[in-house]
From Swiss-Prot:
GO terms for molecular function: heme binding; metal ion binding; oxidoreductase activity, acting on the CH-CH group of donors, oxygen as acceptor; peroxidase activity. Keywords: Heme, Heme biosynthesis, Iron, Metal-binding, Oxidoreductase. It comes from Bacillus licheniformis (strain ATCC 14580 / DSM 13 / JCM 2505 / CCUG 7422 / NBRC 12200 / NCIMB 9375 / NCTC 10341 / NRRL NRS-1264 / Gibson 46). It comes from the Bacteria. Fe-coproporphyrin III acts both as a substrate and a redox cofactor. Fe-coproporphyrin III binds at residues 136, 150-154, 177, 190, 228. It catalyses: Fe-coproporphyrin III + 2 H2O2 + 2 H(+) = heme b + 2 CO2 + 4 H2O; Fe-coproporphyrin III + H2O2 + H(+) = harderoheme III + CO2 + 2 H2O; harderoheme III + H2O2 + H(+) = heme b + CO2 + 2 H2O. SUPFAM superfamilies: Dimeric alpha+beta barrel. This is Coproheme decarboxylase. The active site is at 150. One of its GO terms (biological process) is heme B biosynthetic process.
Length: 254
């Protein structure tokens, strides 16, 4: 390996469950045309799907969560984690073939995989056998009151090209960046998913918290860190409130 190749060494990643963020807008006009009984049948069918998907979580083979999105970008977000891309696709198809999907309009989606990089160092032994690492690669999505999702890239322009930095430079920058996130431990749960080759951005960031203001505080503080200020490129932000299965009838009531 040449000196230049060593300098620009690619970060190695540990990869966990595959992730789908599926954002939908309700076609309320069409939904209102249904009778109350018809709507109840559709809600029951969707509730059954959620229960079916929940069985995988009980067996440790995935996780899912549902949030009502605030603003006009979407009405709700379904986030799914599964061991394989095929299983992710199967769930996507199950929902698309459901009666409820007939009254939704796709608003946005994001395909990625839960990721940990070697920027923060690694311990001895097989990391996939480390309980702490496994908990991060194969997480059970929390029942937090609020969610925030956004995609992001590392900048590749002029002197601000992340991919032309040496491994040592990137590792030092990410260590400082990570310390900010650690300051929100217990307040915000963060799941980073890699999407290079899977979607239009390079990473997806999903934040969970019981205090919605923590999203604003965390993202704002990170804007002053060099990783974000100099090298970060961000897509649209989506924020929402947890939509428990028991709340579906009220959410869909018209």
């Amino acid at each position: 390996m040449s000196e230049q190749q060593k300098t620009n060494e690619a970060a190695q990643t540990l990869d966990g469950w595959y992730a789908l963020h599926d954002f939908r807008t309700m076609d309320w006009s069409a939904w209102k045309m249904l009778s109350s009984d018809e709507r109840q049948i559709i809600i029951s069918e969707f509730t059954g799907l959620l229960e079916k998907w929940g069985a995988a979580q009980k067996e440790g083979n995935g996780s899912h969560t549902l949030y009502s999105i605030v603003g006009q970008k979407a009405d709700f977000m379904l986030m799914i984690l599964r061991p394989t891309m095929e299983e992710l696709n199967q769930i996507e198809l199950e929902f698309n073939k459901s009666k409820l999907a007939e009254y939704t309009i796709p608003a946005y989606s994001y395909v990625s995989v839960v990721e940990l990089s070697n920027y923060m160092g690694s311990g001895d032994g097989d990391p996939y056998e480390n309980p702490q690492v496994r908990a991060r690669l194969y997480p059970e999505l929390p029942d937090a009151k609020y969610v925030c999702f956004y995609p992001m890239d590392k900048r590749r322009s002029g002197d601000d090209n992340w991919y032309m930095l040496s491994m040592e430079e990137r590792r030092n920058l990410m260590r400082s960046h990570g310390m900010i996130g650690r300051g929100y431990a217990g307040k915000v749960k963060q799941i980073i998913t890699g999407s290079i080759g899977f979607d239009d951005y390079e990473w997806g960031v999903t934040l969970f918290s019981d205090d919605v203001l923590q999203f604003k505080k965390l993202v704002y503080e990170m804007r002053f860190d060099e990783v974000s200020a100099r090298y970060g490129e961000f897509g649209s932000f989506f924020v929402g409130n947890r939509l428990a299965k028991e709340q579906l009838p009220a959410f869909l009531h018209v």
